């Protein structure tokens, strides 16, 4: 069938199961805009900034592991999308970005000269995004379009997921091709070390048409095709053997103080259900991490807490005191192991699972048993082993009494050290609300199976501390790049990915300014997003940093530095057409949250909070008597406990800061 390339792309996306596209139109993508916008099988959401498109698509993919496409124009269209793409790259989120480009004969690359640009608004985006994509290519041959699309979609979702980007010049977008002549991507050839070119088209058996495209048995590819391509070959993990699964189960059964560290790879790897079953079969404590809060609900009897640099006391006490740590689907970043990483889980036998073999080699993590495996495959094999051993006489832990004591100890930590404390509710009518009380009031009213998205800064940190997860809930943040401005577009992506319940968004007065224009996208599309805006007078995370490490006056913080200001959110709500709710004191929190959640459609609830409330607990440097600042182990979180109390919580020997 004769078809324009841009129309073929649109139809191909639908055939591959994609139903949503986030885009900002532009002249450099005019054929793509036309093809995607008129494809009946695609729902196009038109944002007001390309960064918002990319962030929305990233969050969309987090909800049900389904890709949404992004379409932007040449030059600034592509560069604007970069922050959202690097967020997907670092957090291992599958994405497909399509960008328009000037006609190939007006690109600097086509001249062979060292000029910066030739065409109008030209920028060779592939050179900029090679470091944040699994595969990128400027598609200069219309006959490669099927291959490039299939390759991009395969790589984005295979192994460790991540973004793939195709840059498509105008002359290629508008070219016509016979779709039967297009050659596809052969994943088997690719994984065997080949290029992935299918020798023949679909259903073809050595026809003359395909033979005419071959050069010495290979499809015709010229060096110019390779010049605009970036690609990272990935070693896919082998299938997990039952012997390996059995060895892991054996190690867990032999431990007296085992704990599971559940990472977000469990969600990304579609392993959530089997993870829940394996946890019940193993019957050992579980901690979650910075971006994996929703791997287990808080009231589960085996859930302990959140571990890591921004974790809580129960979670870190469990990790630091364990004698075996089974880490599943977590890359164990610095935020998980802390800056004093030699002291992390220092007396534990560490079984470290990751789908990326390179992550297992990091010098910041001590590993006794590295497990290069797809977490779903690993858990399914462990489940098979456990199902067999469950009916045998020795199916449980070797020392059941010790493990039962350990589970009880973990629950004691959980009960003794809640994040939200009575003091957070003490503020009177003459004082601002407390952010910990605010997060508590929002989370206790959120429903099961509801999605909460948080912006970066206070909502992410305090939300990560204090949000009480219920069954089926999702808690979405971008943890690695942690860009301000994530909030509104991420909530849009989550809302379009899941229509079953209203979306809760918790963001800050600083972060929301970075993509404020997306308030219009929400209101235009009638998206039921409940926006809780934490007003702490500016950039509270940086305020704390400057107060801790530098002298006043503060710089570039907000109301207390005097050199940065923010508009009235009440007036902005009116301008954009949002209902507006406000809470100035703790006593107003409950009613304000309930009113917001009961409002039909999008709504803004502004909560004015105390600017003096620091994040707590958190990892922090400790000053020695001689004035030296040192990073302490993760069991010793600020505000620091008395040494006697800390010692009471340690089963293993304490380390004296020095």
Residue ranges and their predicted role:
Residues 143, 192-197, 201-231, 235-239, ...:
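Phosphate/pyrophosphate-binding active-site segments
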Residues 38, 98, 106-120, 309, ...:
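Thiamine diphosphate
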Residues 1-390, 445, 528-531, 551-552, ...:
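N-terminal alpha/beta PP-like core and its mobile active-site loop of ThDP/TPP-dependent enzymes
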Residues 6-9, 14-19, 24-27, 32-39, ...:
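Active-site diphosphate/adenylate-binding microenvironment
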Residues 24-26, 45-55, 70-77, 140-141, ...:
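Active-site nucleophile and cofactor-binding loops and adjacent substrate-binding regions
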Residues 132, 441-450, 573-578:
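A structural motif corresponding to the C-terminal end of an alpha-helix
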Residues 26, 269-272, 276, 316, ...:
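Conserved structured core elements
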Residues 336-339, 347, 382-387, 395-398, ...:
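Hydrophobic, well-ordered secondary-structure segments
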